[in-house]
Regions:
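N-terminal signal-anchor transmembrane helix
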Residues: 48-108
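Catalytic donor-sugar/metal-binding loop of nucleotide-sugar-dependent glycosyltransferases
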Residues: 265-284
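A conserved acidic beta->alpha catalytic loop
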Residues: 115-124, 143-145
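Basic/Trp-rich segment in TM-proximal cytosolic loops or flexible interdomain/linker regions
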Residues: 1-14, 32, 58-71, 230, ...
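Cell-envelope/extracellular polymer assembly enzymes that use nucleotide-activated donors
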Residues: 77-80, 110, 248, 263
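Long helical/loop segments within the catalytic core of UDP-sugar-dependent glycosyltransferases
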Residues: 130, 134-163, 176-258, 295, ...
Length: 360
């Protein structure tokens, strides 16, 4: 898409923050009792729909989680694994060796590691491994190529030949039979894309990693529930499988966003391409281990999450998606983005009101 498509992000951000400010301010500027039933109704809807989504996990739908048969090697499609790596000298060799040991026909599997302008020993390690393993293909980009992870993945697309693409992070870990089970799931559900449940490898490192492990499990539970009530499911970057034809039809990976997975999820939704969620096997990754890294990560997620609504909001209001999907998106937009900001404004107004009463 053109740069002009994204030029109104700041204006939309201002409008969004202003709306949150007003929603928090109006009850304080008036008699709050007048808004009691409105707040009560909204709270009931939020809790009720959340309980429905969670409860659906106790009735695991066959198409969501169980497989009636194992797909044969003859039926398996050609798969290209894509990994964008920058300064990953500590994990890249381990990743390559694990990928090469996955159960999958060797004539149907290609591994592409994109060296995205690394300044450490990653290029040297990849050069050595590419001479050692024929299935490994290394694609290199200059440090100033631009586009981030999306740019690296788009650059590698022209070298791929498979029907399906599996995007992994450099710290990803898969079970040996993950690919076989993944395509058995694809065949039964007729999905255009599939997201593997994410799991944490360093869960016992500290309190933060333990919390992230629980968070990932809860996210998968919500994803299951949303999908089972005909809501919206989303990709999560690491461990996302997508049909190459579908990706190209959607315009490839968006290089003008900080969360290409969330952006792509909405574009797939608008094109009526179905995203499945597979609980087992999971894709395992390392959780961030310190608070500064966690805050930076969450800031990026929040920014990218809002960007997609600003970019595609007008299309989401059209008939391209059904009413239940619109409700689901609205619900999680309010829950994840609007309510936290409204709560901050509300807290500020409450403290200001309390201080004013104290000084009277």
């Amino acid at each position: 898409m053109s740069k002009g498509f994204y030029k109104n992000r700041r204006l939309k951000s201002f409008i969004f923050l202003s709306a949150c400010f007003l929603v928090a301010f109006i009850p304080h500027a008036n008699n709050i009792e007048n808004f009691f039933y409105i707040i009560l109704t909204l709270s009931f809807v939020i809790v009720f729909y959340g309980l429905i989504v969670i409860s659906r996990n106790f009735k695991r739908n066959k198409v969501l989680n169980t497989l009636s048969r194992r797909i044969s090697n003859k039926e398996l499609p050609v798969l290209d694994i894509l990994v964008a790596a920058r300064d990953e000298e500590n994990v890249i060799e381990r990743l390559v060796e694990r990928l090469l040991n996955l159960d999958y026909p060797t004539n149907k599997l290609n591994i592409y590691i994109i060296d995205d302008g690394s300044s450490d020993k990653t290029p040297l390690i990849l050069d050595r491994l590419s001479r050692q393993y024929e299935k490994l293909k290394v694609v290199s980009r200059s440090p100033n190529a631009g586009g981030g992870k999306s740019g690296a993945l788009n650059y590698a697309l022209k070298f791929t030949h498979g029907e399906w693409l599996l995007v992994l992070d450099a710290d990803a870990e898969l079970k040996q039979d993950s690919l076989i089970r993944l395509f058995s799931f694809v065949e039964e559900g007729d999905w255009s894309a599939v997201q593997l449940r994410k799991s944490v490898t360093n869960v016992s490192k500290n309190f933060l990693t333990s919390c992230q492990s629980m968070e990932m499990a809860m996210d998968a539970i919500f994803q299951y529930g949303r999908l089972s009530v005909a809501g919206v499911s989303e990709l999560r970057g690491n461990g996302q499988l997508i049909k190459k034809e579908t990706l190209l039809a959607c315009g490839s990976f968006n290089e003008d966003t900080v969360t290409d997975d969330l952006d792509l999820s909405l574009r797939l939704l608008l094109s009526k391409s179905r995203i499945g969620i597979l609980w087992d096997p999971p894709v395992m990754e390392e959780a961030v281990e310190n608070l500064n890294a966690l805050l930076a990560q969450r800031q990026r997620w929040a920014e990218g999450g809002l960007q997609r609504f600003f970019d595609y909001g007008d299309q989401l209001l059209t008939n391209k998606i059904d009413y239940l999907q619109k409700f689901d998106l609205t619900y999680f937009f309010i829950l994840q983005y609007a309510l936290p900001i409204i709560s901050i404004f509300d807290l500020v107004f409450s403290i200001a009101l309390l201080l004013s009463l104290i000084h009277i």
